[in-house]
Amino acid sequence: MTSPSDVEASTETVDRGSRRNQTNDNPSADLVRVYLNGIGKTALLNAEDEVELAQTIEVGLYAEYLLENSQEPLTRAMKRDLKVLVKEGRKARSHLLEANLRLVVSLAKRYTGRGMPLLDLIQEGNLGLIRAMEKFDYSKGFKFSTYATWWIRQAITRGMADQSRTIRLPVHLVEQVNKLSRIKREMYQQLGREATNEELAEESGIEESKIEMLLRQSRDPVSLDMPVGADEEAPLGDFIEDSEATDAESAVVASLRHSDIRTVLDTLEQREQDVIRLRYGLDDGVPRTLDQIGRQFGLSRERVRQIEREVMSKLRDGARAEKLRAYAQ
């Protein structure tokens, strides 16, 4: 009988094997078949079997505790008996795990087609099965397989949240997305059409205001490098507009405007040019206050204001105004 660590190691070996053989014809199906044949050799358990195994596991754990933490000296015979109980407990643990591996496969198959290979789903489910066995309390009267189902599903959905999505989502959100996707498929089969958000909200118990958000989260991301078009030579990113980019016409107009402004300013006295450049941030885009400009040139606030007014008056007259008028329209 294999130990629990052997169960974990075997699933990891199957998982690694699937990655090494991706170039073979349908290697995953072959590995799943081998795995199913292996786990199918252990008979299923009834409720009485589960309780008996759980009791044996509990006794084994207590015996292991006594061996490691006993406050009283243990005789050789006592140690021998305790070691036997530990060994029997570990066998029972392995038996309980192996008898429920088919349950993991059954649940894992329900999550295929969502971005994660079946063997990876099984691996995650097996971790949930081990966790269920560690938490199982036979004295409460639950059947182990019923109790383990919740832990297996939780482990699979969390594994999917961590591994299958390019953009990871919180676990609670993944569970809601999965629930809504399942309901959406079922309602499509019943209605023969896509269900409305209102219908999905009523069926799922999720607020209608959250439905659209969850549906968006359920969509798989698309790479901007994905080839599109008839010849599939151009990447998708080439067809998406950059709303923040400056178009060619705007760039030309901006260049001409700056050139004309420089030409107009060159007709002013140097101090007038400096004051206007600082006042309107023409060089660095940062406008200065009258006080800031006054401190820089040793002028009063009112004198700076006077220079600004004089310049504005000059710019409204003659050729200077004509050159700038086009940009004010």
Swiss-Prot record:
Chain intervals for the UniProt region annotation (Disordered): 1-27
Placement of sequence motif Polymerase core binding: 120-133
Domain of life: Bacteria
Any coiled-coil regions, as ranges: none
Molecular functions per Gene Ontology: DNA binding; sigma factor activity
SUPFAM superfamilies, per database record: Sigma2 domain of RNA polymerase sigma factors, Sigma3 and sigma4 domains of RNA polymerase sigma factors
PANTHER family in the cross-refs: RNA POLYMERASE SIGMA FACTOR RPO, RNA POLYMERASE SIGMA FACTOR RPOD
Entry protein name: RNA polymerase sigma factor SigB
